[in-house]
Structures are given as structure tokens and as C-alpha cells.
Design a protein with these regions (language model features):
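Short beta-strand edge/turn micro-motifs at domain boundaries
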Residues: 2-6, 123-158
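Beta-strand residues in well-ordered beta-sheet regions across diverse protein folds
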Residues: 57, 109-110, 142
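Hydrophobic alpha-helical core bundles mediating ligand binding, dimerization, or RNAP-core interactions
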Residues: 25-32, 50, 76-81, 113, ...
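Hydrophobic/aromatic beta-strand elements that line small-molecule binding cavities or substrate pockets
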Residues: 94-100, 112-115, 127-133, 146
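Short, low-complexity N-terminal intrinsically disordered segments enriched in polar/charged residues
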Residues: 1-52, 159-163
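Short, cysteine-centered beta-strand-loop-beta hairpins and adjacent loop/turn segments enriched
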Residues: 115-123
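A solvent-exposed, acidic/Ser-Thr-rich amphipathic alpha-helical stretch
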Residues: 41-105
Length: 163
């Protein structure tokens, strides 16, 4: 499931970067789910994964969260957590996590999340490209772009070509 490509980094450093980012996403998923299901309430835990300023771009919006308060606030990730609580969200798993190392301080992560409700039914397939940067606090998501369900090319798995 995980792939890495290197651009100007040594194989050893690329391997470590991929390992570090995989570890971050292995912690991120459960933290996000626990917050969204109400098992925990320490919203500051999200700051272990996000770095301000945080840019999030979707098909109908482009928002910039300039500081930690904006990230955690109702117009930021705090609002997303609240919406999921109200929608009977219960679980999310990372179906794809392809890491493309850009250099020793940046990587793109092509991820596909599967969100499920309390009965286990699929609520949403959420594809996102993350720009992850090495900050003074460690690896942090600094930008996220919601994409069609697909890869960096933007060609979704659910699209068909008419050849």
C-alpha cells in the first residue's frame, strides 16, 4: 500500500522519511476517530499532526487556518469533528497512503480514507493529497487538497474512459 519516490534525497534518508510519515499517519487516524466519536476531547491533540498556517482546499472551498486556534476552531478541523459527531460517524481507516518524498523536509502523501457509520456502513471515500513538512515540532500536515477518489493525477478510480 505504501510507496515512496525520491527526488534529491538519499535512499537512507528517503527510507527514514517514509517511515516517520507512515508512523505519523498511523497515529493520526486513531486520534481523529477518537475525537470525532467523543472517546476523547483534547482537540489540541490535532496539533501533533497539523501545522499552522494550514491550507485546506476542496471542490467548493479554499480555507487558510492562520494559527492553531483557527485549526481547532469551528471553521477549521474542530467544525469537521463536530459535523462527523452529528452524522453518526464511528470509524475511519486509511485505505491508501502513498508517500512521495520531495526532499529532506517535504513530502506529498496521497491518501484515501474510508469513513464508516456506527453500523459499519461506508459513509464516504475521502481522497486527499497532503503536503507534509518537517517543522521544528516534527512532521506536520501544512496543506490538504480534497481530490477525486484517485491519485496525484486527479484521475479517479471511479472514472472510466471511453476508448
Amino acid at each position: 500500500m505504501n510507496q515512496s519516490k525520491q527526488k534529491g534525497t538519499s535512499t537512507a534518508s528517503t527510507s527514514q522519511i517514509v517511515s516517520d510519515i507512515n508512523e505519523m499517519f498511523e497515529r493520526y487516524g486513531p486520534t481523529f476517530v477518537d475525537l470525532a466519536t467523543g472517546k476523547r476531547s483534547d482537540m489540541d491533540a490535532l496539533l501533533e499532526f497539523y501545522g499552522a498556517p494550514l491550507r485546506f482546499i476542496g471542490p467548493t472551498f479554499h480555507m487558510v487556518m492562520k494559527d492553531n486556534a483557527a485549526i481547532l476552531g469551528p471553521a477549521g478541523m474542530g467544525g469537521e469533528i463536530d459535523r462527523l459527531r452529528q452524522a453518526n460517524f464511528a470509524a475511519s481507516n486509511l485505505d491508501r497512503c502513498d508517500i512521495n518524498v520531495l526532499n529532506d523536509r517535504a513530502a506529498l502523501v496521497d491518501a484515501l480514507w474510508l469513513r464508516r457509520d456506527a453500523k459499519g456502513a461506508l459513509m464516504e471515500r475521502f481522497a486527499v493529497i497532503y503536503l507534509v513538512a518537517l517543522t521544528a515540532e516534527g512532521w506536520r500536515i501544512t496543506s490538504a487538497v480534497n481530490t477525486v477518489e484517485g491519485s496525484l493525477t486527479g484521475k479517479g478510480n471511479n472514472q472510466t474512459s471511453k476508448d
